[in-house]
Amino acid sequence: LSAEAMAEHTIGVMLMFSAKLLLSVNNQRKKFWQKYVMNDTLYNKNLLVVGAGKIGRCIVSKAKAFNMNVVGVKKEPTELQNFDKVVATEKLSEYVAWADYVVCTLPLTSETEKIFNYDMFCKMNSEGIFINISRGKLVDENEIIKALEEKAIKGAALDVFDVEPLPKDSPLWDMENVIVTTHSSGRIENFIDKTIPVFIDSFESFTKDKKPKTVIDLDKRY
């Protein structure tokens, strides 16, 4: 249910960086009129979607409208619609260097916890933007702060954090190259009303000994 909203959120924050809207918001707060702001575009940029599940696929379907080049990262690579290529998780460190935008939609497991650490950020393109809309513990928070301070990456859009609410003393709040949102990328109006039909469908499948559409694998944890 949240996939469409999360995908639109992702496209939105990418545009915040490419169209220099984040810069303009920061300048507005300072009442600073910056001449000759040069915008970029998403056209022909490289997008790495780490986690090619429903949310990742939804992001890619929208990214293709901007003619972005898209590679997906998946534990078990398969050909997927709209992706130019899908590679195994073992190749993540290779492809982060290729990407202009790295979007994390991975599930949190023992294998993926803190998969994005300082070493991984240092392998990214120094002009790259990191976006996390999945789980806070996929990222080593202290190490992304270090990477941002050292300009190992250009910026980040973070919707999830190790501790929520994000502590007021976190440096992330004050970084001008960081967009902080409050675990809200998937929140939509009338969410409860929209979940009821899904619940009824799953419940009816369960009572008829059929596999519900929303079942998860408890061993994989997703």
Q: How would you name each of these model-derived features?
A:
Residues 1-9, 23, 164-222:
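C-terminal helix-to-coil terminal segments
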Residues 77-171:
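Rossmann-like adenosine-cofactor binding region
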Residues 52-53:
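Glycine-rich Rossmann-fold phosphate-binding loop(s) that bind the pyrophosphate
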Residues 10, 14, 99, 148, ...:
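Hydrophobic "lid"/C-terminal helical patch
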Residues 70-72:
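Short beta-strand "acidic-cap" motif of Rossmann-like dinucleotide-binding folds
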Residues 1-46, 65:
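Phosphate-binding beta-alpha-beta segment of Rossmann-like dinucleotide-binding domains, i.e.
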Residues 60, 64, 148-149:
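Gly/Ala-rich phosphate-binding loop of Rossmann-like dinucleotide-binding domains
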Residues 56-57:
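N-terminal Rossmann-fold NAD(P) dinucleotide-binding loop
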